[in-house]
Amino acid sequence: MKKRYLLLALAAVALVLLILGLCLWLPSNSKPHNHVYPRAAVAADALRCSEIGRDTLRDGGSAVDAAIAALLCVGLMNAHSMGIGGGLFLTIYNSTTRKAEIINAREVAPRLASASMFNSSEQSEEGGLSVAVPGEIRGYELAHQRHGRLPWARLFQPSIELASQGFPVGKGLAAALERSQDAIKRHPALCEVFCRNGNVLREGDLVTMPRLAKTYETLAVEGAQAFYNGSLTAQIVKDIQEAGGIVTAEDLNNYRAELIEQPLRISLGDAQLYAPNAPLSGPVLALILNILKGYNFSRASVETPEQKGLTYHRIVEAFRFAYAKRTLLGDPKFVNVTEVVRNMSSEFFADQLRARISDTTTHPDSYYEPEFYTPDDAGTAHLSVVSDDGSAVSATSTINLYFGSKVRSRISGILFNDEMDDFSSPNITNQFGVRPSPANFITPGKQPLSSMCPVIIVGEDGQVRMVVGASGGTQITTSTALAIIHSLWFGYDVKRAVEEPRLHNQLLPNTTTLEKGIDQAVAAALKTRHHYIQDASTFIGVVQAIVRTPSGWAAASDSRKGGEPAGY
């Protein structure tokens, strides 16, 4: 009998060991529980797009190839945020040369544009007049020419299939459709895609984009030239002008993406942060971090309610000082912002501002010395990529407000931006009585100020430490800053760094907005220090980040928009 029990026990042990062995060693298609990938990772704001980026890397593509393929997908699955009718910035790091560069494919004002062309914000937010010259495809082209490995057409194929066959409406698109349903229903060309039986689509409903699939096919075969000086150009111009716009064929013919080989760079301890300069918000992010690094934040800075409350008060005060200086920025090709940028990226200047932060109280907005105001921007999508060889791409793309100008071509399927709304107008003074910023007034060929700041952080060993960026209009810069602070200084893992409830203050309005779920000790500490507190109506920003860990690349796509990363 004892022998029988012994044999049964041995058999049971063997079975357990076999099961454990199978779990540990057999190949699995399931996603890693913690999204840590040994070789490469893609974090987009839609899972299918992360997977398309991952598959591109697996097929031998570069980080840039993966970014382009994933962005083409995001332009479908989160069409309310970005697409080929918009523009983007890419921050690219080459692990072989150990050099970072920026590709600027932001939209520009048409040649017929003028500083006084808008008498109301409605004109700049919706309709053909709000459309700036798109740059997205020229940006892809330049990035691919410099860093592509796979054929250009290969990058379009997964999204052509997706647009043709259809895909379920995701969390982010569903929320945007619900929020914008009145505008969608007002525009038959939008309702053609995003409505069913007179109502906007809901999460899980199937959406197809056959006309945009055809346009993707044309671009795949004919290249970017088809958009700017080829078979698509006349129809693009016709669509915009019939909606009241002023974009011409000459505007499209003359558009070029710009290579910037000297990105804005600041030191974060033994690491270097690379980000775009003006007219993007790299200088704003630099000033925030330079002010705060003087406090030597660490995990101990958030260990007790008292410490955490003081720490977040200091963070908000840094936001306020940085946004006051943001109003001086503009397109450096048209306005001289050299001294402004030099100050905003200077540790000495940051030290002076830090000395003005009181640990016991906030101050009226005039204390921070805003000289002008700049309009809020909105929308956007961000993705982060790290490839097998350690190269990285941080890309932020936008059509500005949800569904851009609301002008969608019923021929090409392209949804056009309303980027002209990102300029300041001399005819529109904001509700706080602060004058609009002349540095951001409209001039033909000029790019408007933007909150976008795609970031790559590199260690002194030349290896990427973090790839991060955000979407969410004026909340982009603060959301990106918080993700960096959470990860690098507080020691949070990347998922917590991205998911931690956020707060935002852009000085005007003089309000500190808090996300639901934020630590009540923080809210109480801010109230004690006389901050005017307001609960966020939805959420603050959407962040995608990848961080190097001893186990591999830890990736996080923000659940606020329903994204999920992929890798291998």
From Swiss-Prot:
Residues 1-4 are cytoplasmic. Keywords: Acyltransferase, Cell membrane, Disulfide bond, Glutathione biosynthesis, Glycoprotein, Hydrolase, Membrane, Protease, Signal-anchor, Transferase, Transmembrane, Transmembrane helix, Zymogen. Its EC number is 3.4.19.13, 2.3.2.2, 3.4.19.14. It is found in: Cell membrane. Heterodimer composed of the light and heavy chains. The active site is located in the light chain. The chain crosses the membrane at residues 5-26. GO terms for cellular component: plasma membrane. Residues 27-568 are extracellular. This is Glutathione hydrolase 1 proenzyme. It is a single-pass type II membrane protein. Disulfide bonds join 49-73, 191-195. Glycans are attached at residues 94, 119, 229, 296, 336, 343, 427, 510. Pathway: Sulfur metabolism; glutathione metabolism; Lipid metabolism; leukotriene D4 biosynthesis. N-glycosylated on both chains. GO terms for molecular function: glutathione hydrolase activity; leukotriene C4 gamma-glutamyl transferase activity; leukotriene-C(4) hydrolase. Gene3D superfamilies: 1.10.246.130, 3.60.20.40. Activated by autocatalytic cleavage. Belongs to the gamma-glutamyltransferase family. GO terms for biological process: glutamate metabolic process; glutathione biosynthetic process; glutathione catabolic process; peptide modification; regulation of immune system process; regulation of inflammatory response; zymogen activation. L-glutamate binds at residues 106, 398-400, 419, 422, 450-451, 473. It holds the Pfam family G_glu_transpept. The keyword Hydrolase applies.
